[in-house]
Amino acid sequence: MAKKVVGYIKLQVKAGQANPSPPVGPALGQRGLNIMEFCKAFNAATQKLEPGLPVPVIITAYSDRTFTFITKSTPATTLLKKAAGISSGSKRPNTEKVGKVTRKQLEEIAKAKEPDLTAADLDAAVRTIAGSARSMGLVVEG
């Protein structure tokens, strides 16, 4: 018989830096899950990623207090800010531009995000990422 799913927990945790402090501890503690077990498993799963990049994770909690988790790719906005060398997006993206990204940078981000995007091909994925860049106040070159 399959385990009964109690709930899903969505978090953003920095790669390789999961620890029992908030937001991880309280979120898992509410469901009675083993916090240290998750931290060790998550840190092992994200050790190949650049330390400190936020990684979205979806944790499935079961009735017998076990869990499974799926990691997603780093959010596009974080990758765009890193590529443009800025700390935050524009408060008024239509009038106030805060940085520039090239088509090549957008292609690299699209390749990294490809498993999580619903785009049909690389060009469509690049257009999606370019739209995110423009909505942050970045100028897309190329």
UniProtKB/Swiss-Prot annotation:
Keywords: Methylation, Ribonucleoprotein, Ribosomal protein, RNA-binding, rRNA-binding. CDD domains: Ribosomal_L11 (cd00349). InterPro entries: Ribosomal_uL11, Ribosomal_uL11_bac-typ, Ribosomal_uL11_C, Ribosomal_uL11_C_sf, Ribosomal_uL11_CS, Ribosomal_uL11_N, Ribosomal_uL11_N_sf. One or more lysine residues are methylated. SUPFAM superfamilies: Ribosomal L11/L12e N-terminal domain, Ribosomal protein L11, C-terminal domain. Pfam families: Ribosomal_L11, Ribosomal_L11_N. PROSITE patterns: RIBOSOMAL_L11. GO terms for biological process: translation. One of its GO terms (molecular function) is structural constituent of ribosome. One of its GO terms (cellular component) is cytosolic large ribosomal subunit. The keyword Secreted does not apply. It comes from the Bacteria. NCBIfam families: L11_bact (TIGR01632). HAMAP family: Ribosomal_uL11. Forms part of the ribosomal stalk which helps the ribosome interact with GTP-bound translation factors. Belongs to the universal ribosomal protein uL11 family. Part of the ribosomal stalk of the 50S ribosomal subunit. Interacts with L10 and the large rRNA to form the base of the stalk. L10 forms an elongated spine to which L12 dimers bind in a sequential fashion forming a multimeric L10(L12)X complex. This is Large ribosomal subunit protein uL11. The gene is rplK.
